[in-house]
Design a protein with these regions (language model features):
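Segments forming oxygen-rich coordination pockets for charged ligands
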Residues: 1-165
Length: 165
């Protein structure tokens, strides 16, 4: 869907769950793509998190190429006080704003092609300018590699494992 929206000339916001603490229905690496009118595919957590994110997106809040947002927890970094997660849980999400003029659609096509052939890729995202590079990866261990304060986030995108009986 992200490729279609970009090809239609629409800006998209690609969101990736970076970390969770406590109760969370999605694990790190879960993704959602949205556009300015609030249309979206995928999920970050379910319910109130998506609702809050999409409300803020429609209001024009996410203007940077990439930013990490936090929901829940007791941290002062929680800029979403109206969203409380169960049992003191916390969720950190990478939000990437991508315009149709960027080379990002080519990266998405490459990613889709590799996934279709059973290969995994690592997306390396720079927080300062939102630059993204793709790298082959053999180890499918951690889906997200990021230390708070680091300017680089590595996200492993791999084909979904299937059990055939």
């Amino acid at each position: 869907q992200a490729i279609d929206w970009l090809e239609q000339g629409q800006t998209i916001w690609l969101c990736t769950v970076l970390s969770t603490f406590g109760s969370s229905p999605r694990e790190p690496g879960a993704m959602m793509v949205a556009k300015a009118d609030g249309a979206h595919v995928g999920s970050l957590s379910g319910g109130c998190v998506e609702e809050d994110f999409l409300d803020r997106l429609v209001q024009g809040e996410y203007t940077l190429p990439s930013v990490v947002i936090r929901y829940g927890g007791d941290s002062e970094e929680n800029r979403n006080p109206k969203v409380k997660l169960p049992c003191g849980g916390a969720l950190e999400v990478l939000v990437e704003k991508r315009s149709p003029e960027s080379h990002f659609v080519d990266q998405l096509r490459t990613l889709l092609q590799r996934l279709s052939s059973g290969e995994a890729l690592e997306r390396e995202v720079g927080l300062a300018g939102g630059n993204v590079s793709l790298h082959p990866v053999d180890d499918h261990g951690s889906r997200v590699i990021w230390e708070q304060g680091s300017e680089t986030i590595k996200i492993v995108v791999a084909p979904v494992a299937r059990l055939i009986l």
